[in-house]
């Protein structure tokens, strides 16, 4: 912690944002101790201290939002990438995902400490039907319950809007996700995009 805080002070920044991801439940208690210690060091040096977190789920409870809310100045909820690059389903971050993340966080952290991180990017998803062979290979796995193979690439806001125009598609409001949505067929599959505008 000393080196991180010293570097922040030397650089003249306002604070430190801690963003450790994919921490195992086994390491949770040690991570929370790091958060406590780094918080003390930041406050001793007049630095603001914030911690990034996934949307609260049972599998990441070891991040201990309640304790973070006590020791950190801000608890940031990364309310984006509901479905990530490797997901079986497409869609970036629906309004229900954002709302759920905020509501769960507010049960453990004071509202004046919560920051909801929202995306300034989206993903262009490409879906193709899986072959019978692929489905057979996936039998008995979660992947087998999805008939399409999905891939995606991240796009900035302007690039995302331009991809819809370039495809000759029209985005329409999707009431469920509360986002503009477009899809089109090309390259032997279906492109889908949810626009964060």
Label for each model-derived stretch:
Residues 76-77, 83, 100-129:
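Active-site region of glycoside hydrolase catalytic domains
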Residues 64, 94, 110, 155-156, ...:
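Helix N-cap and loop-to-helix transition residues
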Residues 122-197:
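Glycan-binding loop/region signatures in secreted carbohydrate-active enzymes
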Residues 85-104, 184-196:
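Gly/Pro-rich active-site loop or hairpin
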Residues 1-95:
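Chitinase-like catalytic core of GlcNAc-active glycosidases
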Residues 42, 74-78, 99-102, 139-145:
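Glycine-rich loops and low-complexity Gly/Arg-rich segments
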Residues 67-82, 106-108, 119, 150-170:
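Surface-exposed substrate-engagement region within the catalytic domains
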Residues 45-46, 107-112, 146-148:
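Structural alpha-beta junctions
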């Amino acid at each position: 912690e000393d080196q991180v805080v010293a570097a922040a002070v030397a650089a003249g920044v306002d604070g430190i944002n801690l963003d450790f991801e994919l921490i195992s439940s086994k390491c949770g208690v040690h991570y929370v101790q790091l958060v406590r210690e780094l918080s003390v060091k930041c406050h001793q040096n007049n630095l603001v201290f914030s911690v990034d977190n996934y949307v609260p789920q049972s599998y990441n409870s070891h991040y201990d939002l309640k304790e973070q809310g006590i020791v950190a100045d801000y608890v940031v909820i990364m309310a984006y990438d509901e479905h990530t690059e490797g997901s079986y389903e497409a869609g970036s971050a629906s309004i229900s995902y954002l709302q759920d993340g905020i509501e769960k966080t507010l049960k453990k952290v004071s509202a004046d400490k919560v920051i909801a991180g929202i995306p300034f990017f989206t993903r262009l998803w490409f879906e193709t039907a899986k072959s019978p062979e692929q489905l057979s290979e996936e039998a008995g796995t979660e992947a087998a319950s999805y008939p399409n193979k999905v891939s995606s690439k991240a796009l900035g806001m302007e690039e995302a809007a331009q991809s819809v125009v370039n495809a000759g598609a029209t985005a329409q409001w999707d009431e469920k996700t509360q986002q503009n949505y477009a899809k089109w067929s090309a390259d032997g599959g279906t492109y889908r995009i949810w626009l964060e505008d």
